[in-house]
Design a protein with these regions (language model features):
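Short glycine/serine- and small hydrophobic-enriched flexible loop segments
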Residues: 47-54, 117-121
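Active-site neighborhoods of divalent-metal-dependent phosphate/nucleic-acid chemistry enzymes
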Residues: 78-131
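Short, well-structured N-terminal submotif of metal-dependent ribonuclease cores
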Residues: 1-41, 52-65
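Acidic, PIN/NYN-like endoribonuclease modules and their adjacent C-terminal/linker elements
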Residues: 1-3, 117-150
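Aromatic- and histidine-enriched alpha-helix N-cap/loop-to-helix transition segments
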Residues: 37-43, 108-111
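Helix-adjacent hinge/juxtasegments
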Residues: 51-86
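Alpha-helix capping/helix-boundary segments
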Residues: 11, 41, 88, 112, ...
Length: 150
């Protein structure tokens, strides 16, 4: 079974059609794949839906329906949610210290990467799925296998 850790930049594409959506749907639809996200992604998804409402991409009622769908997917086991621990915060700080001056590594991206790295070191992941080029560069430098969706 292949396991994929999704950053929110890619995960959002499951719920809102945009560049890279077909790649994301293909990963989800393969029964041999296991999808994992961090708890942070749930909050980031709420924010992503709110931004899409604010910019007029979707209506507030559509955002509510997308959230209901996401919660239904969570309940059905379509993906696993990993906790964010104190250790992840520490690693995120170390990643920012190591890469923040040369790369555009933002706080929440560093935290996502810390969770993904932890999962990779514990059990291995077949791909860190993302749509953020700056984060992809840092993840690659950390030897995570990258699946870039765009």
């Amino acid at each position: 079974m292949a396991e994929y850790f999704f950053d929110t930049s890619a995960f959002v594409k499951r719920y809102h059609p945009e560049a890279g959506t077909q790649q994301v749907l293909a990963l989800f639809s393969n029964p041999k794949n296991r999808v994992v996200i961090s708890r942070l992604s749930l909050v980031e998804m709420q924010s992503a839906f709110a931004v899409k409402v604010h910019t007029g991409e979707i209506s507030q009622s559509t955002a509510a329906m997308l959230w209901i769908q996401l919660m239904a997917d969570l309940s059905s086991g379509a993906f696993e949610v990993l906790p964010v621990t104190d250790g992840h915060y520490q690693v995120a700080g170390e990643l920012i210290e190591r890469y923040g001056f040369r790369h555009r590594l933002r706080t929440l991206d560093a935290l996502q990467l810390a969770v993904g790295l932890d999962k990779h070191h514990q059990a291995g992941v077949d791909g860190f799925v993302l749509a953020d080029q700056a984060l992809a560069e840092v993840a690659s430098a950390e030897k995570l296998p990258i699946v870039f969706v765009s």
